[in-house]
Amino acid sequence: MKFYIDDLPILFPYPRIYPEQYQYMCDLKHSLDAGGIALLEMPSGTGKTISLLSLIVSYQQHYPEHRKLIYCSRTMSEIDKALAELKRLMAYRTSQLGYEEPFLGLGLTSRKNLCLHPSVRREKNGNVVDARCRSLTAGFVREQRLAGMDVPTCEFHDNLEDLEPHSLISNGVWTLDDITEYGEKTTRCPYFTVRRMLPFCNVIIYSYHYLLDPKIAERVSRELSKDCIVVFDEAHNIDNVCIESLSIDLTESSLRKASKSILSLEQKVNEVKQSDSKKLQDEYQKLVRGLQDANAANDEDQFMANPVLPEDVLKEAVPGNIRRAEHFIAFLKRFVEYLKTRMKVLHVIAETPTSFLQHVKDITFIDKKPLRFCAERLTSLVRALQISLVEDFHSLQQVVAFATLVATYERGFILILEPFETENATVPNPILRFSCLDASIAIKPVFERFRSVIITSGTLSPLDMYPKMLQFNTVMQESYGMSLARNCFLPMVVTRGSDQVAISSKFEARNDPSVVRNYGNILVEFSKITPDGLVAFFPSYLYLESIVSSWQSMGILDEVWKYKLILVETPDPHETTLALETYRAACSNGRGAVLLSVARGKVSEGVDFDHHYGRAVIMFGIPYQYTESRVLKARLEFLRDTYQIREADFLTFDAMRHAAQCLGRVLRGKDDHGIMVLADKRYGRSDKRTKLPKWIQQYITEGATNLSTDMSLALAKKFLRTMAQPFTASDQEGISWWSLDDLLIHQKKALKSAAIEQSKHEDEMDIDVVET
């Protein structure tokens, strides 16, 4: 389908378009014209990704000054899906235009997913893979090999060295599988192929961390130009990603490992002093001249990037007391020993970075300035010593990153020292949490650097919370409804059981036997009437375990077994993957299954249950965060004092965005259908419901907001009977989707109404002039 938005020709790779897709593309185009930040909430399953890509690729080709799209998503599966959509779009553009445009689209993920080296790819831990990769690909390793030394290298990486960076791969859209196959065929490293081709790409699709986490962004995204268009897709959790990228946890175990790493560094320094003291002398001279000079090496060799934001890195020489290698090692020893003594606590301590630094100075005489240079100084030392096996240095990296962060940032951070790592632990296992409280710190450089930033998801409501939390002004802020020829999803609020007892996951009520029994009855009854797959979500793993145990003793699970298999999500990703595969198999072969999951878990965030895989979703309770968490309490206090966001408002906003995310799992298109059950009396209150996305709110009828279990079952049965009636594509024509003719008619009407509005406005202006 080809149509115009203003003067921009759009090629859309489907013969039909949803009305909300067209509106979304219009708003996208206007926000790109204006520059700045747009916040757009698009309903689940309405083709958000292809709308974005069609509009922005057309915009790129029409306005060549906007040459690059940086598309950030959260999970591997979403990156793969976006690349597949882009590939389809470019194939369609080629067929319509009659020639192939010079276009390169690439996706980037971690070494763990792209590595081809036989021994490295076997490793399960991402940090170990990164370290092993560096030990084979660092510049000095290659130099040693060329000098005739017998050192292991990676042939996949070595084969890239003789090629020009811009000619590693040909134009086209390369999915992650494509680039891996190409690497196997040509014996070239897929990871470094993509890394080196990023400056030459038209579209880059990768994870948020490549742009928001300074430790990664400084290596990967530093060379991207300011005229890039940045899209954060599935961005409902973007504030949490920002906070995690600047937060660090240290435990006693990590400090012990850091001490071992310091000892091995010391040993290496002594060896180098004996064999080649000029190395250390050269490094010292470079540090005297200035740190940037010392680190002027290939980014691919870098041991670690600076954990602070680029504008917060000090552009000056390293302080004299940590320039010499032996002095720096003594400095690290002293700091780690100090942290170990701080760990010996029996009660919780919370303090600001300023008071922590003052305490460090009082006890150890360590100043703030050298701490601030720790990360860069360690990187320089590891490079000078030419240490290739760095996998044991991960804990030391964390310690120096902590030192650099705590000495750099005074506002928006807190240190919390807890004697127990988990709430229900009995054996002391102290943990030092350095937590970022202000999400705007990490994203601010992105807003300042790039001309256009689009933040979009299916669950951003209430929209006004994000500009407050992330400190930005929008040029466009919109939540779209959903146009349906028939209501293909049924959202309803169940506030009480069949015995009229109110149901809630509130802490005081959650273990009440009548509430547990009523929740169990809801699961049993919906298992009976729902065909194929049913997904249930709970506020936490703790509550899930507790209620499943109670249901087992009440015989409720035995009752559910009669109708469907029962599978449970666990914190272990491998177990959860296995449970999902079994769930899908049971749905496909007609046995049917119930998947018991957790809001904020893997299932709620990245797994789609389209068609028969999810005919109903039940949200048991409201997924509030654990409010006794000290980090959360500190963040709530910060939001209240700094941005005037009340605690209750933030907690409700956070809970409702996760509830909406869970509900959206079962609706993956307008030809799909599903039941959405909100099982908690608190959902009956309008202050909760109004925080749901517009596309869910518009289909919650007044009669479905205060139901008992029996009433909800009657509504669900009626809905499923309706969905079973024949419903063809022609029934949706002109309502839930438009052909090209429908679209042109709509555009004419819009132009006509705009002209009428304009003439009215001019008439009013004339009247004002006459009166004056």
UniProtKB/Swiss-Prot annotation:
InterPro entries: ATP-dep_Helicase_C (IPR006555), DinG/Rad3-like (IPR045028), HBB (IPR010643), Helic_SF1/SF2_ATP-bd_DinG/Rad3 (IPR014013), Helicase-like_DEXD_c2 (IPR006554), P-loop_NTPase (IPR027417), RAD3-like_helicase_DEAD (IPR010614), Rad3/Chl1-like (IPR013020). The keyword Iron-sulfur applies. It is an enzyme of class 5 (isomerase). Binds 1 [4Fe-4S] cluster. It is found in: Nucleus. ATP binds at M42, P43, S44, G45, T46, G47, K48, T49. Residues 7-283 form the Helicase ATP-binding domain. The keyword Iron-sulfur applies. A motif (DEAH box) lies at residues 233-236. Disruption phenotype: Essential, it cannot be deleted. Keywords: 4Fe-4S, ATP-binding, DNA damage, DNA repair, DNA-binding, Helicase, Hydrolase, Iron, Iron-sulfur, Isomerase, Metal-binding, Nucleotide-binding, Nucleus. Its EC number is 5.6.2.3. [4Fe-4S] cluster binds at C115, C133, C154, C189. It comes from the Eukaryota. One of its GO terms (cellular component) is cytosol. One of its GO terms (biological process) is nucleotide-excision repair. Its cofactor is [4Fe-4S] cluster. Its main location: nucleus. It holds the Pfam family Helicase_C_2. Belongs to the helicase family. RAD3/XPD subfamily. ATP-dependent 5'-3' DNA helicase, component of the general transcription and DNA repair factor IIH (TFIIH) core complex, which is involved in general and transcription-coupled nucleotide excision repair (NER) of damaged DNA and, when complexed to TFIIK, in RNA transcription by RNA polymerase II. In NER, TFIIH acts by opening DNA around the lesion to allow the excision of the damaged oligonucleotide and its replacement by a new DNA fragment. The ATP-dependent helicase activity of XPD/rad15 is required for DNA opening. In transcription, TFIIH has an essential role in transcription initiation. Component of the 7-subunit TFIIH core complex composed of XPB/ptr8, XPD/rad15, ssl1, tfb1, tfb2, tfb4 and tfb5, which is active in NER. The core complex associates with the 3-subunit CTD-kinase module TFIIK composed of mcs2/cyclin H, mcs6/cdk7 and pmh1/tfb3 to form the 10-subunit holoenzyme (holo-TFIIH) active in transcription. NCBIfam families: rad3. This is General transcription and DNA repair factor IIH helicase subunit XPD. It comes from Schizosaccharomyces pombe (strain 972 / ATCC 24843).
